[in-house]
Every structure is written in structure tokens, then in C-alpha cells.
Amino acid sequence: MVEPREQFFQDLLSAVDQQMDTVKNDIKDIMKEKTSFMVSFENFIERYDTMEKNIQDLQNKYEEMAANLMTVMTDTKIQLGAIIAQLEILMINGTPLPAKKTTIKEAMPLPSSNTNNDQTSPPASGKTSETPKKNPTNAMFFTRSEWASSKTFREKFLTPEIQAILDEQFANKTGIERLHAEGLYMWRTQFSDEQKKMVKEMMKK
């Protein structure tokens, strides 16, 4: 027969063992929760980094779009300034600026509203006057729709060489995009630095 004292200690040890098992199980549960939390936290950090990168990419694209828009607006302003400058020069002395290229340097007069503009008087010397060379600067007096849609207009004011260059350079562009590209090309290649400087000075006024 077990003595009361021994029974007491056995019960106590048994209770301690059970409590230890409970503590061990609690610790295991806590470790599982910790592991799960760490995985969730790492996933959150990864998603946060991805989101931050996407935001940065969007910001970069926005800044690039803003820069491109400013470039287009600047180029368009320059082209409009060129048209205004040409009109002002024509109003002052009736003569447009000569083109930069030597092959198309001589200016061709603008079409006259006179219905008899196809008839020309022979020179006093009796010799046939030389046909004026085409001058692309005269093309700046016309609208974009005329530029794009009128084949006669292009043939009248642009040399075959210039037409071929435009068709080759901008074959993959259409509509307003092509009109802008062609206008910008003409501005950059057919106007001298002095002419561009004059236009920019007039735009500042």
C-alpha cells in the first residue's frame, strides 16, 4: 500500500509532466504561428517592393510623357513661329526667306489669285525666263491639310528629291503624326541657323 506522502509526490510529478507537455505543445503552436507570420510578412514585403517599383515605373513613364509633350509643344511653337515670321516678312517686302539648301535656294512666288496667273509675259530680251526652282519655305504658307492632301501642292513646292526623302523617312507615319514629323523635318533641314534664330527672336516678342 502506497503511503499518502508518496502518493502526493507521484500525483505532483504527474501534474508537472502534464503541465510540461501542455507548455511544449503551446511552444510548438507559437513557433508555427511565428513561422506563418514570418512567411506572411515576407510576402507583404515582397508585394510592397513590387508595388513601390510599379509606382516608380509609372512616375518615370509620366515624366517621360511630360518631357515628350513639352518637346512636341516646343516644336509646334517653333513651327507656328516660322509661319508667322514668314508671313510678316512677306507682308514687309513680299519676299520669303531663301531656303537653306543650295539646290532649292531660289524662291518660287506664291500662287496668285489672278485667274490669268497661268499666262506669263515674255521677258523684254525675248528669251524664255528660267523656271524658278521650288522653295519649301513657301510651303509654310499653307495649312497642314493642304500639305498632306494636295499632290499638286507637294509637286509645286517640293522638289522630287525632298518628296522622296519625306516618303522614305515617314512611310510608317500617318495623319497628324506624319504632318508633324514632315513639318519638323522641313524646319530642321530647310532653314538656316540664322533663319531659325530670327524666328525664335520674333517669338519672344
Swiss-Prot record:
Which spans does this entry mark as compositional bias, Polar residues?
Answer: 111-141
Its name, as the record gives it, is: Uncharacterized protein K205R
Residue ranges annotated as coiled coil are 10-75
Q: Give the organism, scientific name.
A: African swine fever virus (strain Badajoz 1971 Vero-adapted) (Ba71V)
Q: Does the keyword Coiled coil apply?
A: yes
Q: What job does the chain carry out? A: Induces host endoplasmic reticulum stress and consequently activates autophagy and NF-kappa-B signaling pathway. In turn, may induce autophagy-mediated STING1 degradation and innate immune evasion.
Q: Where in the cell is it found?
A: Host cytoplasm
Q: What is the lineage of its organism?
A: Viruses, Varidnaviria, Bamfordvirae, Nucleocytoviricota, Pokkesviricetes
GO cellular-component term (any): host cell cytoplasm
Keywords annotated in UniProt: Activation of host autophagy by virus, Coiled coil, Early protein, Host cytoplasm, Host-virus interaction
